């Protein structure tokens, strides 16, 4: 298995390169072939323009394509519950529903397919096979049903067998083995021969079909599009078959290798299933084609399949799939295999031709194949009962034998003909391998387990099969998919028998397998992730051999539950059936884990990008290496999504079809959900949430439902807008609460609407996508999209799970995983498919492996943890339907498929439409976001925009969770769309919880692929580059990544503008792209600068993502804790990544400083981020993550704006606006305006100063927003991760204050950069976190106290009244949580001395002394700006466009929080507002101290930047040096203080555990970010302290308290102390860098010394707090001592002795009694002894008697008596006694003796036969009993 895994990994590697080739060349033809010839995928871009043929398939299967969508609707309608339950559950439900519908449709569709079959007759082989088909009419229906059933079974089997395949690639064939072996067992020679022969003919046919398909496909595909690749693949396949024959010649000397190769394919198909998912571009890249074919097949199949299989087939399909498909599908497959293999070969020929001829031929071929399917489906209709009879593997082997005999004869004829045909067809490629495959298949089936298992090692043995397997896996992966699917349907023989069907279904099933894999990947992403997929996969690869039989039986049995769940399966496929599988985890593992493993396979494929699987990692690297592999992944995930849809609805035949269609959206989201689930599983696994099994199950229960429920609840509520967090709680909340919210903004009817719109859209959008993909631009994006987006996204969720999202799999963990997980992930997947997805995908592939593996592990663990079973019950909403609903509802039909940008638009259109729906539901949140974005983008400072934001705020408050989650989801989606387009694709994922993994992968991959993604972004934004180009050219000196990001931003902005809502989309996309661009820029600078941050950032990001996902997964169970974890994760993913991004962006900022236009762009980005931020507040984690990212980027933008625009007014304005918006949300707009003006005046006064001010403002605003959120989720806030992202000029300071008391997992991300002075702004990430934690502790502690009352006031007051707020925040936090206490502790160093002080008092004291002049100047500047930019508007609405832009972000973010927190904050905060307004000068002063502090914070950021910010190389080096100098002072001083302080109070242990571990795990980036975050919490209070301290001794006193926190903080994040020390240590102590350094100087003295002393007090406090706990524990230990004394008391011992004595006595007595009991009486004690003697000797005697009696003259009764006694003389002696006794007590004393004696004596009458029998029986019984 390890070899197999390695081979899987190998296969991915070579599959990555050669398979990429094959994917690009060989497999696109094979994709068509796999796509069922009719997948009709043009493969324009990446062989991905599957839409044409796919649509042709859809058109041809117009009803089916629509039916797929309709089915998705119907199934999704059913699955609405199902998908809510789980991807797998949905998958199973879809399998059942689709099977039921397919069964229902099958009857009508079979007739259609009969007609189609008549069409199919056009195919010579199909005709011949159809001709062969009649000889086996049952098989013909079985074949038809094999096509359908096999399709369904392949869908189900893909789900199962792909699960199994992926779980047990061997098992797929070992299933055949097992079936064949079962047949062997049943018919050891003949049946095995039949099984092997049928299997062999089938295998031969399958393999010839496979090979022939590979030969035909590869030959014809070579003819068609990739002749050499296909030929190479075919030759490789032959090589693998033949060399495999040589290499794997274990028991399969020459032929076994081919089966081994086939097994390798099966195994490697599992591997390839993975590969197919990601690495095997054939089923994956062809996956779109294959899904086309599969979709068409599935269209055919679902129609009859859903109907005919409704009861019988779902089970046969899943469980009955093994059952019915084995029988029916054996017959069917044998029959169908004959027609199908010829049909497929003919389609192969046709496909080759059609590949040449194009989609039309593929469509025709598909149609032909589909008619073949239809015929077999019709024919299979008869067998369904048989299939139903075959629900169990026992039946399967028997029926398989029966069918094998039947099919063997018929299929031998057909297969022989077909094999001859195939051999003739395949002879050029490998006729001998066909025979070898036949023979080998016989041997293989005999030795399938060995062969498969050996083949797995052998597959790993012959690396050349890597090349060979590239083609082989491509073809064979198709076929293996088909085979595995067929095997799943036909278990083994069906797999092989069905392999001709497998060939066609290799095309179809490859598509379907891709679909199923996608489904299975999506579902198994859940299931697999639930199941320890790697464990299961490896085990299952081995176990699959075992489990395949068991899995066939289990699959039959489980599939019977699946079947039972047919209708229930829609709900319980994962839930009930999967729970059954969970119960049958091991057995069902085959089936269930087939789903799981299919998903794992897919997931591993996707987790190739998301190293959810080892092979996933390997393959992930491989897939990462080759874009076609990501296309394979993408296609695989698309295929998975489609394979999954095959089970569900075959929404898009091709992955992109379903990906880009509503189906694609739904499935993209579903896939994202699955990938998120995968990611969640991965995350859970990373968390080690009970290992893969536990986590996978848990993920199935929780995380998978996260994604599923994301889609489910989203689709149910609003697929995209309200992507449910993969969190079980979130899903429950979202499903129940958020779903209600979603219903608020997305009515339950919307799913149908979304769904219904989806179907036409699917064809339209598929066509559009095809066209878009055909478009050159789209070629890049669409191709990448096909490959990378789904796979990467899938990996990220779904992780995957997956990600999947993270890779699609995670990103179940944060709000993004919750809200944006599906939406963001699906859209990331889609958008990945749109923009630069290969790069993103590859970067994901490259970077996520760490993250993804964690994701994979976490997700699988999380899913297992969730068990995927319970959660599925929770989430009954169909995953596809919700996502499809949300996506369809978003009017994605036209928009999403318009092109690459259109795809992004579609995603954004989906998002925007979803957002519009959300806006409809959420009021004008998105419109306001758009207005805000527009205002930001236009920097037209519309007061109305802010007013809208306030309206939005109100609406957000009304729809805080609903709308903002949706908006956040949309922001995520848009973010994802943009990030998909941009390198920031995954960073945007960071923006949301779900996107964490993706964002991590993105962040991880972006630094690697930042340039390429930027290049791709440039491509995607090329049309729009002109917009950015002036500033970019101006900035060209600046970081190219920033340029590329700005390009993408503006281009995406333009694209978005050209999208549905030009402004909405632009704003959204600008927001998203701002995030993405900033992130890519950040990454590019990181990459360029090669800062520690890049590596550390990547590692941290990966670790963080894993930890984040782990947190998410772990925290997901309860929404509150989930929220806290999500927020932490969001902070970590978003905050730390954002810190990374912000640092990079800051570096970019420094570069961008020169270009005002860049600043404008960044303002737009800030606006985007502002808009982005508005979404997040609903989702605490996504809110904070997005907020953090948006704010960080916004700050970053503002920083560059402020720097670049030397007119601080403009650059200040965006920051100001964004931050005041937060404050506005937190408090009243007037206050925001005042502060904004204050900040802006400060900005005018000093850009850097203003920046610090803005940072502080941002800190305050973000803190206010966070407070809002905290207030919104006061309970959550405890467990909340307060992430203060402060972007200073050089640094992004993310202060994560994790109050792990975390009643809720809310993650508050504050962006301090907006509200902090520029100097402070650099520290803003840290300072902001510090502000967030400390101002949150100080300013927000009070606002949190009064947070419900006046959210904005805390922010304002935070800036103006840092200590006062600290007090309030302390109070609030004390009230709220230990986090508040930590905030108190954080603020205690400020508040301890100034607890009762109002912020005014301390700040006035602090500010005047510290930076009185500076603050006065700044105050004048800020007041200028306030006056210039209406102070009222600043508070109420900022009229300045940029300010508006800046405001919008906070406003949106704050809006949620305002709604939540206003009640709490409003009154207190209004008072504080008054104070803040009254003390806006003080705030300026605070900002100035913040500036002073900000420098250190900025230095902290610099350190972080070293960690994460590679962009600010020019600024960073000096700052870094300074930072290092300061780090020396401050790292030991401030960082430790900060690190220890915030977390120790309440966050410290949890936060430390989460953040600290995450920081350490995340490496320096995480450490820097976490440290910065934690320090920033201290840094901001220290800033306040610094301000106060510099100004007043009181502040130093507070600062003294403050440093206390950092040491504790440092203890939390030991590695991060340096960063806080930067903030504490001025950037340039004596070098005032435009007032940034000057304040930093002041901060230095104040911060350095006070933080040390404060750190100790804080640490002491924190330590004291734990120590009292420890003392309490000691008291408990005292109790333990008492316990010890109690035992010493001897009572326990006495009791124990007594008990022991009693027990011993009782036992002895019991033994004696037992003796007497056997004796049957006191008198019979001797008899008992005799019994002993009898037993002892009677055994021998019995044995003797047994031997002798049987042989000892049975005829001679007397002789027997004599002989008996003589033989058992010793016994006869006893026997004499016994006989003597036995007459009286014979029955009692020695029944054995009595029997013998009776036999001997009284039973003498019984003549020798009976006597001998009795003697034998007695002796046997005596021997048994006696022995």
Curated annotation (Swiss-Prot):
<feature type="modified residue" description="Phosphoserine">
    <location>
        <position position="629"/>
    </location>
</feature>
<feature type="region of interest" description="Disordered">
    <location>
        <begin position="109"/>
        <end position="221"/>
    </location>
</feature>
<dbReference type="GO" id="GO:0002162">
    <property type="term" value="F:dystroglycan binding"/>
</dbReference>
<feature type="compositionally biased region" description="Basic and acidic residues">
    <location>
        <begin position="175"/>
        <end position="194"/>
    </location>
</feature>
<feature type="repeat" description="Tau/MAP 2">
    <location>
        <begin position="1692"/>
        <end position="1722"/>
    </location>
</feature>
<feature type="repeat" description="Tau/MAP 3">
    <location>
        <begin position="1723"/>
        <end position="1754"/>
    </location>
</feature>
<feature type="compositionally biased region" description="Acidic residues">
    <location>
        <begin position="1327"/>
        <end position="1337"/>
    </location>
</feature>
<dbReference type="GO" id="GO:0000226">
    <property type="term" value="P:microtubule cytoskeleton organization"/>
</dbReference>
<dbReference type="GO" id="GO:0150014">
    <property type="term" value="C:apical distal dendrite"/>
</dbReference>
<dbReference type="GO" id="GO:1990769">
    <property type="term" value="C:proximal neuron projection"/>
</dbReference>
<feature type="modified residue" description="Phosphoserine">
    <location>
        <position position="143"/>
    </location>
</feature>
<feature type="compositionally biased region" description="Basic and acidic residues">
    <location>
        <begin position="435"/>
        <end position="467"/>
    </location>
</feature>
<feature type="compositionally biased region" description="Basic and acidic residues">
    <location>
        <begin position="1"/>
        <end position="11"/>
    </location>
</feature>
<dbReference type="GO" id="GO:0005874">
    <property type="term" value="C:microtubule"/>
</dbReference>
<dbReference type="GO" id="GO:0031113">
    <property type="term" value="P:regulation of microtubule polymerization"/>
</dbReference>
<keyword id="KW-0966">Cell projection</keyword>
<feature type="compositionally biased region" description="Polar residues">
    <location>
        <begin position="63"/>
        <end position="73"/>
    </location>
</feature>
<feature type="compositionally biased region" description="Low complexity">
    <location>
        <begin position="1587"/>
        <end position="1603"/>
    </location>
</feature>
<feature type="modified residue" description="Phosphoserine">
    <location>
        <position position="1133"/>
    </location>
</feature>
<keyword id="KW-0677">Repeat</keyword>
<feature type="compositionally biased region" description="Basic and acidic residues">
    <location>
        <begin position="1097"/>
        <end position="1155"/>
    </location>
</feature>
<dbReference type="GO" id="GO:1901953">
    <property type="term" value="P:positive regulation of anterograde dense core granule transport"/>
</dbReference>
<feature type="region of interest" description="Calmodulin-binding">
    <location>
        <begin position="1447"/>
        <end position="1467"/>
    </location>
</feature>
<dbReference type="GO" id="GO:0031175">
    <property type="term" value="P:neuron projection development"/>
</dbReference>
<feature type="modified residue" description="Phosphoserine">
    <location>
        <position position="1787"/>
    </location>
</feature>
<feature type="modified residue" description="Phosphoserine">
    <location>
        <position position="881"/>
    </location>
</feature>
<feature type="compositionally biased region" description="Basic and acidic residues">
    <location>
        <begin position="945"/>
        <end position="982"/>
    </location>
</feature>
<dbReference type="GO" id="GO:0008017">
    <property type="term" value="F:microtubule binding"/>
</dbReference>
<feature type="modified residue" description="Phosphoserine">
    <location>
        <position position="1782"/>
    </location>
</feature>
<feature type="modified residue" description="Phosphoserine">
    <location>
        <position position="1795"/>
    </location>
</feature>
<dbReference type="InterPro" id="IPR013588">
    <property type="entry name" value="MAP2_projctn"/>
</dbReference>
<feature type="modified residue" description="Phosphoserine">
    <location>
        <position position="1353"/>
    </location>
</feature>
<feature type="compositionally biased region" description="Basic and acidic residues">
    <location>
        <begin position="1440"/>
        <end position="1459"/>
    </location>
</feature>
<feature type="modified residue" description="Phosphoserine">
    <location>
        <position position="736"/>
    </location>
</feature>
<dbReference type="GO" id="GO:0043198">
    <property type="term" value="C:dendritic shaft"/>
</dbReference>
<feature type="modified residue" description="Phosphothreonine">
    <location>
        <position position="1619"/>
    </location>
</feature>
<dbReference type="InterPro" id="IPR027324">
    <property type="entry name" value="MAP2/MAP4/Tau"/>
</dbReference>
<dbReference type="GO" id="GO:0005875">
    <property type="term" value="C:microtubule associated complex"/>
</dbReference>
<dbReference type="GO" id="GO:1903744">
    <property type="term" value="P:positive regulation of anterograde synaptic vesicle transport"/>
</dbReference>
<comment type="subunit">
    <text>Interacts with KNDC1 (via KIND2); the interaction enhances MAP2 phosphorylation and localizes KNDC1 to dendrites. Interacts with DPYSL5.</text>
</comment>
<feature type="compositionally biased region" description="Basic and acidic residues">
    <location>
        <begin position="1407"/>
        <end position="1425"/>
    </location>
</feature>
<feature type="compositionally biased region" description="Low complexity">
    <location>
        <begin position="1562"/>
        <end position="1574"/>
    </location>
</feature>
């Amino acid at each position: 298995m390890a070899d197999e895994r390695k081979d899987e990994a190998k296969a991915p590697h070579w599959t990555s390169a050669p398979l990429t080739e094959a994917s690009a060349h060989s497999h696109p033809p094979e994709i068509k072939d796999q796509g069922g010839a009719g997948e009709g995928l043009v493969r324009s871009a990446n062989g991905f323009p599957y839409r044409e043929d796919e649509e042709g398939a859809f058109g041809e299967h117009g009803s089916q394509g629509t039916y797929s969508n309709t089915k998705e609707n119907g199934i999704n309608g059913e699955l609405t519950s199902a998908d809510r339950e789980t991807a797998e559950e949905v998958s199973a439900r879809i399998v059942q529903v689709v099977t039921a519908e397919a069964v229902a449709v099958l009857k009508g569709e079979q007739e259609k397919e009969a007609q189609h079959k008549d069409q199919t007759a056009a195919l010579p082989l199909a005709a011949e096979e159809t001709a062969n088909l009649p000889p086996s009419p049952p098989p013909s229906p079985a074949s038809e049903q094999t096509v359908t059933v096999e399709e369904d079974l392949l869908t189900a089997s893909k789900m199962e067998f792909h699960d199994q395949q992926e779980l047990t690639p061997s098992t797929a064939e070992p299933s055949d083995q097992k079936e064949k072996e079962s047949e062997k067992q049943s018919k050891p020679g003949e049946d095995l021969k039949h099984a092997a022969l049928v299997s062999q003919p089938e295998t031969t046919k399958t393999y010839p079909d496979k090979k022939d398909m590979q030969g035909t496909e590869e030959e014809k595909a070579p003819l068609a599009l990739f002749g050499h690749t296909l030929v190479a693949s075919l030759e490789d396949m032959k090589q693998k078959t033949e060399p495999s024959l040589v290499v794997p010649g274990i028991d399969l000397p020459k032929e076994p290798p081919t089966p081994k190769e086939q097994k390798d394919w099966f195994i490697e198909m599992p591997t390839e299933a993975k590969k197919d998912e990601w690495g095997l571009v054939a089923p994956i890249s062809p996956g779109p084609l294959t899904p086309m074919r599969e979709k068409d097949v599935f269209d055919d199949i679902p129609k009859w399949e859903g109907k005919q299989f409704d009861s019988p087939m779902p089970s046969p399909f899943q469980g009955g799939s093994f059952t019915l498909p084995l029988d029916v599908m054996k017959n069917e497959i044998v029959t169908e295999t004959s027609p199908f293999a010829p049909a497929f070969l003919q389609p192969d020929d046709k496909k080759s031709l059609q590949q040449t001829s194009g989609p039309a031929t593929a469509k025709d071929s598909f149609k032909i194949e589909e008619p073949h399917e239809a015929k077999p489906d019709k024919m299979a209709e008869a067998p369904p009962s048989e299939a139903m009879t075959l629900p169990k593997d026992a039946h399967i082997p028997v029926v398989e034998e029966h069918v094998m005999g039947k099919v063997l004869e018929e299929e031998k004829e057909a297969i022989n003909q077909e094999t001859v045909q195939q051999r003739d067809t395949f002879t050029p490629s490998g006729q001998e391998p066909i025979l070898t495959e036949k023979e080998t298949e016989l041997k293989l089936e005999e030795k399938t387990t060995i062969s498969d298992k050996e083949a797995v090692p052998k597959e790993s043995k012959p690396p050349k099969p890597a090349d060979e397997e590239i083609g082989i896996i491509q073809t064979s992966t198709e076929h293996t998919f088909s085979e595995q699917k067929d095997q799943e349907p036909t278990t083994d023989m069906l797999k092989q028998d069905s392999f001709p069907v497998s060939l066609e279904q290799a095309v179809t099933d490859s598509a379907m397998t891709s679909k199923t894999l996608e489904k299975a990947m999506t579902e198994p992403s859940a299931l697999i992730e639930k199941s320890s997929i790697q464990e299961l996969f490896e085990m299952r690869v081995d176990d699959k051999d075992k489990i395949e039989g068991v899995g066939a039986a289990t699959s039959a049995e489980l599939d019977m539950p699946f079947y039972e769940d047919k209708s229930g399966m829609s709900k319980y496929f994962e839930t009930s059936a999967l729970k059954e599988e969970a119960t049958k985890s091991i057995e069902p593992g085959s089936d269930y884990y087939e789903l799981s493993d299919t998903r794992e396979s897919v997931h591993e494929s996707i987790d190739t990008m998301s190293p959810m699987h080892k092979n996933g990692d390997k393959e992930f690297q491989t897939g990462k290496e080759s874009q076609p592999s990501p296309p394979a992944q993408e296609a695989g995930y698309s295929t998975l999504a489609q394979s999954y849809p095959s089970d569900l609805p075959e929404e898009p035949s091709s992955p992109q079809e379903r990906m880009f269609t509503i189906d694609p959206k739904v499935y993209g989201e579903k896939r994202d959900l699955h990938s998120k689930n995968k990611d969640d599983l991965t995350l859970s696994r990373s968390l080690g949430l009970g290992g893969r099994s536990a986590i996978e199950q848990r993920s199935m229960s929780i995380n998978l439902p996260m994604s599923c429920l994301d889609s489910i609840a989203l689709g149910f509520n609003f697929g995209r807008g309200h992507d449910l967090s993969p969190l079980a709680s979130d899903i429950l909340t979202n499903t129940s609460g958020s779903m209600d919210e979603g219903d608020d903004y997305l009515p339950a009817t919307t799913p149908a609407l979304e769904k219904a719109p989806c179907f036409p859209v699917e064809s339209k959008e598929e066509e559009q996508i095809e066209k878009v993909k055909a478009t050159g631009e789209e070629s890049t994006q669409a191709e990448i999209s096909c490959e990378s987006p789904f796979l990467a996204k899938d990996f990220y969720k779904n992780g995957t799970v997956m990600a999947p999202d993270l890779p699609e799999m995670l990103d179940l963990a944060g709000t993004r995983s919750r809200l944006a997980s599906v939406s963001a992930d699906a859209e990331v997947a889609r958008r990945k498919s749109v923009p630069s997805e290969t790069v993103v995908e590859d970067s994901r592939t490259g970077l996520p492996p760490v993250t993804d593996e964690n994701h994979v592990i976490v997700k699988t663990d999380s899913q297992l943890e969730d068990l995927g079973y319970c959660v599925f019950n929770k989430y009954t909403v169909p995953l596809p339907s919700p996502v499809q609903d949300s996506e369809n509802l978003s009017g994605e039909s036209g928009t999403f498929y318009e092109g690459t940008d259109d795809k992004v638009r579609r995603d954004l259109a989906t998002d925007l439409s979803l957002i519009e729906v959300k806006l409809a539901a959420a009021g004008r949140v998105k419109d306001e976001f758009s207005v805000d974005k527009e205002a930001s983008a236009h920097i037209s400072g519309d007061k109305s925009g802010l007013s809208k934001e306030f309206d939005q705020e109100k609406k957000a408050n009304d729809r805080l969770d609903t709308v903002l989650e949706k908006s956040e989801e949309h922001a995520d989606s848009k973010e994802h769309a943009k990030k998909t387009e941009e390198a920031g694709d995954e960073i945007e994922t960071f923006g949301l919880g779900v996107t964490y993994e993706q964002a991590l992968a993105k962040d991880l991959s972006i630094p690697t692929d930042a340039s390429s993604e930027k290049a791709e972004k440039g491509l995607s934004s090329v049309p729009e580059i002109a917009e950015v180009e002036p500033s970019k050219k101006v900035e060209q000196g600046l970081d190219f990544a920033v340029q590329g990001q700005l390009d993408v931003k503006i281009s995406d902005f333009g694209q978005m503008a050209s999208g549905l809502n030009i402004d909405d989309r632009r704003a959204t996309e600008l927001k998203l792209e701002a995030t993405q661009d900033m992130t890519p820029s950040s990454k590019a600078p990181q990459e360029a600068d090669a800062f520690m941050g890049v590596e550390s950032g990547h590692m941290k990001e990966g670790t963080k993502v894993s930890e984040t996902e782990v947190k998410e997964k772990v925290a997901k169970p309860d929404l509150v804790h989930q929220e806290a974890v999500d927020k932490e994760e969001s902070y970590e993913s978003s905050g730390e990544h954002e810190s990374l991004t912000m640092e990079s962006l800051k570096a970019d900022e420094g570069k961008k400083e020169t270009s005002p236009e860049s600043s404008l762009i960044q303002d737009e980005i800030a606006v985007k981020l502002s808009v982005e931020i508005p979404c997040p507040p609903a989702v605490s984690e996504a809110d904070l993550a997005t907020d953090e990212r948006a704010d960080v980027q916004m700050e970053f933008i503002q920083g560059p704006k402020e720097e670049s625009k030397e007119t601080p007014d403009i650059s200040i304005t965006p920051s100001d606006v964004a931050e005041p918006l937060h404050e506005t949300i937190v408090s009243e707009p007037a206050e925001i305006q005042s502060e904004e003006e204050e900040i802006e005046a400060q900005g005018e006064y000093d850009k850097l100063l203003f920046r610090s001010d803005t940072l502080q403002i941002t800190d305050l605003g973000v803190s206010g927003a966070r407070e809002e959120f905290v207030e919104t989720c006061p309970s959550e806030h405890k467990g909340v991760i307060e992430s203060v992202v402060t972007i200073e000029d050089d640094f992004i300071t993310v202060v994560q204050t994790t109050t792990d008391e975390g009643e809720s997992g809310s993650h508050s991300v504050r962006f301090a950069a907006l509200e902090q002075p520029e100097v402070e702004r650099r520290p803003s990430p840290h300072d902001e976190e510090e502000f967030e934690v400390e101002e949150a502790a100080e300013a927000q502690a009070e606002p949190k106290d009064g947070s419900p009352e006046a959210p904005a006031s805390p922010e304002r007051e935070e800036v103006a009244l840092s200590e006062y707020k600290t007090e309030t925040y302390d109070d609030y936090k004390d009230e709220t949580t230990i986090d508040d206490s930590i905030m108190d502790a954080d603020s205690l160093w400020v508040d301890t001395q100034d607890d009762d002080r109002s912020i005014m008092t301390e700040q006035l004291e602090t500010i005047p002394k510290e930076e009185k002049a500076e603050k006065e100047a700044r105050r004048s500047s800020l007041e200028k700006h306030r006056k210039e930019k209406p102070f009222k508007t600043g508070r109420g609405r900022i009229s300045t466009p940029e300010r508006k832009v800046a405001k919008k972000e906070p406003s949106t973010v704050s809006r949620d929080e305002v709604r939540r927190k206003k009640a709490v904050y409003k009154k207190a905060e209004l008072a504080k507002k008054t104070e803040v307004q009254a003390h806006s000068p003080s705030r300026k002063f605070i900002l100035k101290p913040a500036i002073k502090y900000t420098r250190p914070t900025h230095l902290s950021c610099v350190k972080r930047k070293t960690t994460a910010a590679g962009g600010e190389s020019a600024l960073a080096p000096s700052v870094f040096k300074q930072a290092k100098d300061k780090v020396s002072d401050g790292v030991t001083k401030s960082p430790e203080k900060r690190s220890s302080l915030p977390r120790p109070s309440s966050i410290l242990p949890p936060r430390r555990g989460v953040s600290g571990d995450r920081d350490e795990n995340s490496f320096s980036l995480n450490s820097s970010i976490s440290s910065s975050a934690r320090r920033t919490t201290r840094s901001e209070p220290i800033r306040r302290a610094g301000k106060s301290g510099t100004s007043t001794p009181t502040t130093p006193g507070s600062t003294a308290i403050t440093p206390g926190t950092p040491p504790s903080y440092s203890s939390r994040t030991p590695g991060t102390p340096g960063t806080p020390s930067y903030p504490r240590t001025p950037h340039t102590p004596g070098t005032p860098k435009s007032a940034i350094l000057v304040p930093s100087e002041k901060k230095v003295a104040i911060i350095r010394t006070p933080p040390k002393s404060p750190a100790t007090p804080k640490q002491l406090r924190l330590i004291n707090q734990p120590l009292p706990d420890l003392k309490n524990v000691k008291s408990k230990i005292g109790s333990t001592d008492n316990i010890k004394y109690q035992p010493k008391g001897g009572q326990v011992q006495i009791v124990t002795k007594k008990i022991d004595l009693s027990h011993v006595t009782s036992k002895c007595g019991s033994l004696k009694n037992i003796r007497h009991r056997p004796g049957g009486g006191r008198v019979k004690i001797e008899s008992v002894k005799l019994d002993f003697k009898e037993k002892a000797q009677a055994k021998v005697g019995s044995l003797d008697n047994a031997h002798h009696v049987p042989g000892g003259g049975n005829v001679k009764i007397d002789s027997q008596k004599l002989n008996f006694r003589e033989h058992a003389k010793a016994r006869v002696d006893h026997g004499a006694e016994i006989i003597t006794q036995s007459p009286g007590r014979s029955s009692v004393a020695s029944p054995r003796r009595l029997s013998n004696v009776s036999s001997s004596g009284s039973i003498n009458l019984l003549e020798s036969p009976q006597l001998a029998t009795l003697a034998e029986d007695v002796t046997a019984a005596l021997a048994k009993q006696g022995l």
